[in-house]
Amino acid sequence: MIGLVVSSADTASVTISDQLHELVEWESHRDAAGDEYEQYDDFEMRTIDEWHLEAENASELFSTTPQIIAFLSRHSGDTGPLLTTHFTGNFGPAEYGGEPGSFAQACPMIQQTLLEAFDRYAPSKYDVGIECTHHGPTTVGAPSLFVELGSSKAEWNDPDGAHAVAQAILELSGEDAPANVETDRTVVGFGGGHYAPRFERIIRETDWVVGHIGADWALDSMGAPAANRDIINHAVTASDADVALVADDRPELTKVISQADIRVVQERWLRETTGVSRPMVSALENALVPIASGLRLGTPATEYDPATSDEFVITDRHTDNDAVGTVHTKDSTDIDTGTNHNVDAERTESEDSHNIRDAIDRADADAVVLAFPTSLMETISGIDIETTNQVFSEHTLAFETTEGGTRPTGRMIVSDYLSVESITHALIDILKLKYDRVERTDETLRVRRQVFDPAKAATLDVPEGPAFGRLAAGESVTVAGRTIDPEAVHTTETVTFPVFSTSSSSSSSSSSSSSSSSSSS
């Protein structure tokens, strides 16, 4: 049951109630104490005389304890027409109801649903948003939030604005309603302004929901984090969160939160993990590096459903971790990942067998950690960094990056050899943009191109300067009455990169090649 609390002292609350009665038919009842209340579907509406922020133990008003309680309220401020919602509590003193340093239980999924519904129903002159945690009540007896119409007398009496709020409230009911949905994707927020734009952005643009938010002014009223650990912990538990986002540079607060075994993340972490199960995120971060250190998650990672598998095992012979599970990697000496971050670009054949098809087939794991050589990645990224990122995002579970997440290092996690093949073919296409000829053997990519050779030009008495530039650009020049063609001063540059074999044997026989015509001298 969803409990609705109307305050007869609050004009906006009464206006919203009127619109709820316009939208649906409510049945009137009286409880054992003789108090009147109304019911519709999963809703029960109670009217009180006092202001909402004084309505402690509101769950006791209802015939049964509600799953959630929504306080239908006005919003006051200089914000213009606004539909908003927020949770209640006090990080500092209790100046407007409730107890100091105390919080009502939040219902983040409900807030997300209301925000989305506000977007659909709000009249054009109204803005839509959320607020930080503030005022009472702090002892409600059920998860709760304020649903507000504002921000002046004109809006409090506006049937159109109230109608939008009423429509949004009615969307909280039903079998698939948020009150019936559990989530492990709740973040508690610290820092920022009263209207919490960063946290609203997280709700709108990721699959994470947000619990209590301690705005800058609220944290300042709380005092030193180290002296108020209980308050911080209460905000976390009242949000049912195990992840926190600190919006500003607050090292002491971050330290206190971390010491309570609450993971402090960046907005990038919330965006990167959107659509990826928490067990999968943990497994990928444990196998490579944390997202904060440059890990990026690929589209295939969103396809893993922890409900259909007890564990997801990642194998990497280069790790010392021998644990197996959804949040661990598995060490296996049977796998040769070919990981080498210092491969010489000029070597002509790989030193080890990189037979990935056999390796993955032999692995007692769901995925393996592999790496393309650094030299190849530097070359590829230098040609087309945007396509390189797209390729790794489309075909890996996760991949490491540098330079603020913009350049893949080549170290990655894949679940099948076809993914490696797809990446390799895509990298060949990128190499073709720079090189005249690209040949693939079973374990190498050999690229060739014609490049200007200053030493050859010097032997033909070509002076440095514009003539060098014209020859390098493929134009002929005349020196001392003699025509020198560009072919005479170009040489064939050959670079060989080791790659992974996907054949059934480890031989180095030619498996495929891709080339265009080239000249050499």
Curated annotation (Swiss-Prot):
Q: What does this protein's UniProt record list under function?
A: D-aminoacyl-tRNA deacylase with broad substrate specificity. By recycling D-aminoacyl-tRNA to D-amino acids and free tRNA molecules, this enzyme counteracts the toxicity associated with the formation of D-aminoacyl-tRNA entities in vivo.
This entry's comment on the bound cofactor is: Binds 2 Zn(2+) ions per subunit.
Segments carrying the region annotation (Disordered) are 323-353, 499-521
Instruction: State where composition is biased (Basic and acidic residues).
Output: 343-353
The identity of this protein, by name, is D-aminoacyl-tRNA deacylase
Give the cofactors, semicolon-separated: Zn(2+)
GO molecular function terms here? Answer: D-aminoacyl-tRNA deacylase activity; zinc ion binding
Record flagged with keyword Metal-binding: yes
What organism does the UniProt record list as the source?
Answer: Haloquadratum walsbyi (strain DSM 16790 / HBSQ001)
Entry EC no(s): 3.1.1.96
Q: Where is the composition biased (Low complexity)?
A: 501-521
Q: What is the catalytic activity of this protein? A: a D-aminoacyl-tRNA + H2O = a tRNA + a D-alpha-amino acid + H(+); glycyl-tRNA(Ala) + H2O = tRNA(Ala) + glycine + H(+)
Q: Which SUPFAM superfamilies match?
A: AF0625-like
